[in-house]
């Protein structure tokens, strides 16, 4: 366990030492929290979701975060352009497909991003991940269904007890 903690501490120190610029195309509900969290770990956030600058900002960034929380047609173009630029430059891309499975627009956007951008980290709740895996889901946005919570709890308990499902 000590080696994991030491590795995390070294990684955190490195982030503080280099203060990387993190380009976020994120939702307006959490934009302030996202910026403050990035600042708290020693990085520097920039929120740029206009197509006129998305690729340019990505080209000077050390990471790109794409979040579909407050999705609109304008930002989809920026997400894809920034993602392609990040891939071209070897910049890691974090993708949060918020609400995937909830609407055709979100489903098509998630599919488009996954087809056009190499994702480094894919994050989301169980409903979103299940939808992306092609499973039947009842997505309600950022919330998971009761069945999803049951499955999540079951997997957690299995992990805690050392059992495989």
Per-region residue spans from a language model:
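Single conserved hydrophobic/aromatic residue that forms the stacking wall/gate
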Residues: 155-158, 162-165
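Conserved N-terminal subdomain of the carbohydrate kinase-like
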Residues: 2-95
